[in-house]
Amino acid sequence: MIADGLVVPIALIGIYALLKLVPNDKKYQVYARVLMAGLTAYVAAKIIGVIYQPDQMRPFEVLGVAAGASFLNNPGFPSDHALFTMAITLAVWFGAKDWRLASICLAMTIMVCVGRVIALVHTPLDVVGGLLIACVGIVWYLPMKRPEKSDI
């Protein structure tokens, strides 16, 4: 249940944080960065998943047992659950700038990742890959200098 069940609370915390904690005058900029960070991480994950696939079978398939959580019919690298939950955690951290909610999201994200491994739907490499690839989107949260008219 942990492997799948905590995704919804993480998403709800993310929605709350981004809707209620981001100042109105910053919403457009924050939402644009969150969108770009998520898209960047997702596209990077799909490209890396096509280029590098450490195993063609998931752990439960190798062991010949039933999966302990939901999964897509693909080899599993990187973990979409890890990618999605970490992307939300980063959005709460950088977008809403609420370290308490981000810490709660991070703890739940780690539980989701451990749960995915315990449920035998991912290897540790799959979930670590998802976590790290989600961090690729951080580039959109870094301060960006607007070009001066003299630079154009």
Which residues does each PLM region occupy?
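Membrane-embedded catalytic cores of phosphoryl/pyrophosphoryl-handling enzymes
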Residues: 70-152
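Hydrophobic alpha-helical bundle signature of multipass membrane enzymes
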Residues: 1-74, 87-94, 99-107, 112
